[in-house]
Structures are given as structure tokens and as C-alpha cells.
Amino acid sequence: VYDDPVGGEPTPRQYRIRNMRDLARFVHKDALHQAYFNAALLLIQWGAPLDEGNPYNALYKRQRGFATLGGPHILTQVSEVASRALKAVWRQKWLVHRRLRPEAYGGLMQMQKLGYEGAKREYGLPDWVFETAAAKAVRGRPSGTYFLPMAFTSGGPVHPAYGAGHAAVAGACATMLKAWFKDDEPLQGRIQAAVHPDTLRPLDVLQPKETPDDDLPAYGGSDAAQMTVGGELNKIACNVAMGRSMGGVHWRTDNTRSLRLGEQVATIMLKRQSKDYAEKPFRLSYRSFDGLLVTVENGAVKVPGDPALEAFYAQ
């Protein structure tokens, strides 16, 4: 929810994220794992069931997890895996790929094709790049240049584009939450029953009340009952990752590959921890971004649908 700026000054009116510019604004100003920490708090508040392999869900019926396998534990897990994912992706950025930001590539296109004050410079860019729909759309703006329009006033970050920090953290945190909670649990009933923690008034998230100032219409899709914990966590991860592209600072593959890098970081972290719990048996499962069932148990990772990925985790 953001202030609605009028004349550069914030006003009391607030609104939900509603378009690509709003989403780009969020991923420019957020704390990196903010969306998933908030999601964890909501899942805990809504009483989302734990994964069936959590001992406190299936075995210890008269106890609840706390410091281990409980609420405080998952909150620290989300924070810890975010840090680990960042370290992994920063190595890829600086020591492996060093990929140009889209903004910088637009600058190369400008200097090769149009130049500056009549002076051009050859960078070896192929002719077809200038004939793409995207290049023509950018050139067709009033400025008439190939400089990329940016949603971020500060422009692109000065570190390389591939992989994407936001996407790696998104993949890691979403995977941690999908493994921790029952990811195929339907969400509609829990969302409809949600109340504000202070006022206890209904939040009306799924079917907001129609008011003159409400810019979010009621959801009319027939698939409302099919929304699940895992599906909504995937949606958050995708929105945050792609929101950086909407800001103009990433290529699509920066995000799609880094989501999977984060997924692997989280899975390896769970694998290493799974041998240390006193509570037995311990097993966590989730659906990967590719729709594969992944199970972590006793220091091993099983991926029946992808033997190569299972072999990777066995290293």
C-alpha cells in the first residue's frame, strides 16, 4: 500500500499495488526479503497448516514447535536463506557472468546507430537488434533515442545484471515457505476469514468492498477456490522478480534463472539441516517452479521427475 503522490507531496490516501509502475516502485524501495517475511507472518496468523512431514503436524499432536520447527524458526529461516541466496548470486554477478544492464546496452545501441553530436562508435552490435519491436518502440518516443526509459529515477544498479539479487532471494524464500507449510493447501477460506490484527475487522482481500475510493475491483475469477499456499507464493516470487524488469534494470533470463538458483540454495540449506533435528521423522516436500515434487529427508533430496537435478543435490 502506497501514498498517492499529488504534486510530489504524499497524501493521506493510499492504494494497493495496481500496475507495473507500482510494482517497480515496490521492488526499488523494499527490504530484500520483505515480501516473504510478510507472507510468513500472514501464513502464521491465518493458521496455515505445516507440511505433513513436520513432526509437530503429524506426530506430536499435543505439542507445537517454537524455537525448532515453529513460528520463530520459519521467520529466521526466511531471513537466513535470503542472505545465503544473495551471497551465491553475487558471486555469479561479479566472478562469472558480468552481464550488461539493459540500460547500458541501450547506450551502446545509441552510440553505434545515432552517436552523440554526430560522433558514432562501433560496438559490433548486429543489425537485427535495431529492427526489433522493442528497439523501434524505444526509438519512437519523443526523445527519438535508444536510451532506455527507466522507472527508477536512480537508473540501473552499478553491479552486473546476471543473476538477479531480488529473483534469487525470491526463489529461496518462496521455496523455504513452500517446504515449511502445506503448499497445496487452498487459501480462499483463510483469506476470507482474515481480519486486521488491531481492529479485528475483515480485510476483504479477495472480495474488497466497493467504495468510491477503492481502485481494486472484486475478484470475479472462477478459479478463486483453486488458489493455494504454493501457488500464491510462486506468484509473489514472480511478481518481485519480474518487477525489477518492469523497472528497466534486468533481462528476463536474469530473473528466470535466478529464481531457480534461489530454489536450489533453499533446498541445499534444508538438506543440511534435516539431519540435525531431534524430532524424528522429519521430512519436508514442495513443488518446484517447474512443477516437480521435491522431498528433503535425513540429509537427502529426492526429485523423482528429474534424475539429473536429484544427482546435483546428492553432491
What are the roles of these predicted feature ranges?
Residues 1-315:
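Hydrophobic alpha-helical bundle signature of multipass membrane enzymes
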